[in-house]
Curated annotation (Swiss-Prot):
EC number of this enzyme: 2.7.7.68
Entry's Gene Ontology BP terms: F420-0 metabolic process
Protein name listed in UniProt: 2-phospho-L-lactate guanylyltransferase
Domain of life the protein comes from: Archaea
């Protein structure tokens, strides 16, 4: 199985602009990417970062084994086109024209991803397995059908269900809190601090920036220490 991790190498995570500077967003995005790559390798696979611009894995905080297992492919096309170019076609996996090698697509902002969560996705038996995100997006999927293609515009999870039906592919929805939580908005940062582990890079980066959990009216939010705020 090929595992592709799309990554916006320039100007990442713009929806976090209200709480992070451009440099901080870049550092945080790369920390999340490093955590995702680590989880993929721990799940027994070799990830390919599908980056919008050149990216040196040496610049990421990665263990040597993870760095050596990974690779980078540069494709500056929109996400849908770039991913579709990586999906299997009939005959990709064998000479008889029938077998194909499945392709998994795992987004780089799944900061809570673990090897166990990924293994549950990778082991799904359907032609197409999808982990929906909040708001009907698609956070991760595995494609084992030569005619299925992605469409990441709008409510992509609903679109992917329809596309699978149209091409005659079986589909399984994989219910996963860890893979279903993508980090896009300031409110999402609380999930990183609550559920991240001590060895994860993303929560460590947020703490370096001065973020901490704050309890107000029975709810947990994040707050940034005043002295750590950019001037």
């Amino acid at each position: 199985m090929q595992v592709v991790v799309p990554f916006a190498a320039t100007e990442p995570k713009t929806r976090l602009a209200d709480v992070l500077t451009p440099a901080e967003r870049t550092a945080f995005a790369r920390a999340m990417l490093a955590d995702v790559l680590t989880a993929v390798v721990e799940a027994g696979h070799e990830p390919t970062v599908l980056a919008t611009a050149p990216l040196d894995l040496e610049t990421l905080d990665l263990e040597a084994a993870v760095r050596d297992a990974g690779s980078v492919a540069v494709d500056d096309r929109p996400l849908t086109e770039a991913v579709n170019a990586r999906l299997p076609e009939r005959g990709d996996g064998g000479d008889d024209g029938t077998h194909i090698d499945p392709v998994a697509v795992v987004m780089a902002d799944l900061a809570l991803a673990t090897a166990d969560a990924l293994e549950a996705l990778f082991s799904a038996a359907a032609d197409v397995a999808v982990v929906p995100g909040r708001g009907a997006g698609t956070n991760a999927l595995v494609v084992d059908h030569p005619e299925f293609r992605v469409d990441y515009h709008g409510a992509s999870y609903l679109d992917h269900r329809e596309i699978a039906h149209d091409v005659g592919a079986t589909l399984e929805t994989v219910d996963s809190f860890r893979l279903g939580t993508d980090i896009d908005e300031p409110a999402d940062l609380v999930e990183v601090l609550v559920h991240g582990t001590e060895t994860d890079r993303a929560p460590a980066r947020l703490r370096e920036f001065g973020f901490e959990l704050e309890r107000t009216d029975g709810r947990v939010t994040v707050a940034r220490l005043e002295e750590s705020r950019p001037k």
